Amino acid sequence: MATFVDRVTVHLRAGNGGNGCVSVRREKFKPLAGPDGGNGGNGGDIVLVADPQVTTLLGYHRRPHRSSGNGGFGMGDHRSGHTGEDLELPVPVGTVVKSSEGAELADLTEPGMRIVAAPGGIGGLGNAALSNPKRKAPGFALLGTPGWEGDILLELKTVADIALVGYPSAGKSSLIAALSAAKPKIADYPFTTLHPNLGVVQVGDVRYTVADVPGLIEGASEGRGLGFEFLRHVERCSALLHVLDCATLEPGRDPLSDLDVILAELAAYPVPEGQLPLLERPQLIALNKIDVPDARELADFLRPDLEARGYRVFEISTVSHEGLRPLSFALAELVERARKEQAVLDETRPRIIVRPKTVDDSGFVVKVEGGSEGPVYRVLGAKPERWVAQTDFQNDEAIGYLAARLAKLGVEDQLVRVGAVAGSTVVIGRENGVVFDWEPTLTSAAELISSPRGTDARIGVNARPTRAQRREDYFDRMDAKAEARAELLREREAGLWKDDDAAVQGGSEETGRE
């Protein structure tokens, strides 16, 4: 069973915002106490936190679906709904957060760094919050918006100062075990190391981290062996240490050819934009296993050739610890130099300037798209899309409120500017946007999703009569019935017609008397 996972796709569902409440205060001797509907609670966020105690993404590989709490609905008596509980997900330091399309969202390189990966929905306002001098008792409330839902990609890139690279069984794991207190798996067969191992080395006042990555072979960039995808763990390293095996018995292999193969594979690895290519970083060479017979002679023979290439060479043995002390001090020197250079870069790095929105920023755009039945005008913007999501399209007053907000924002004026005419198809939102047929004589014309295309529930008159109207209608019907009965009585008395039932009944009585 896998114990180390460095790349995983996680499906997140943030909490939905609670709906606002429609309520009117009912109290004795106060018939006009006013609205008292509370607001809905906000949905919980899903937050990623860089935790130094976490070293793998295995937990998210086993449970890829995570969700936070929903916000509570508003209630009467000005009681707001509860806020949904946030969900904090600990991830290893060095985790890169990417969208499902591959765009980098955040790089959690320091312990304690946080990012809201999935924001929760916004709670809807109750009718108490929507009341004003002109709308004293709103008969509607705003709905809560849904929380963000989708997939993100978590990719772990080990944060280390020095990376050990080399062929399988070159002694990289033994070296990191000799330099630090790390205890990686060590065996005498290739590909013993299947995932990166980290070790902390203390040299004088300098402390640095060494990463042991799985071995590289020729063709790793084409997928041979374990491939070279794990080289993402080398991207953050400031220097490389090539560990060459001077005691290999495999035919066709020698330390120089091994080095050429490793350099070719490192050159084929694409580093992210803005980072220094792997081969342009400081590199040292460690000729390992000089304790083996004939290995020391081979190391002495190869050393001049490697130094002629510009490398600084160390002859070491992880068994006898020979040469490890000067190697550790040389690595510390590289780390100190890289840290000073990084400090200078951080000081000269351009600062991110957040500028406020311009005065004439409307907060939305109108795009004209082609359609089979003519142009489609799509309104995109945070405010219009959120307002549509918060509107209860089963409530006429809520639709009117949406129309007023869109008109005040300037949506109708912008539609006129881009060429929309009466009957044009307008969509607010993206894929699941609300479609309506635009009528410029109205403030807006939001179409009910459940109603036929081109109709608008706001245009219809509210057919529910008042109590006085029902009372007046009842008396009118009673008066009409009384007048009709009186008219029939007058016509019968005038002989214009006679009651057949009465005539039949009279004839039966005469027959009985005979």
From Swiss-Prot:
Subcellular location per the Swiss-Prot or TrEMBL entry: Cytoplasm
Keyword Magnesium on entry: yes
GO cellular component terms listed in the entry, alphabetical order: cytoplasm
Domain OCT: start-end pairs: 356-440
Annotated GO MF terms: GTP binding; GTPase activity; magnesium ion binding
Family: Belongs to the TRAFAC class OBG-HflX-like GTPase superfamily. OBG GTPase family.
Protein name: GTPase Obg
Organism: Leifsonia xyli subsp. xyli (strain CTCB07)
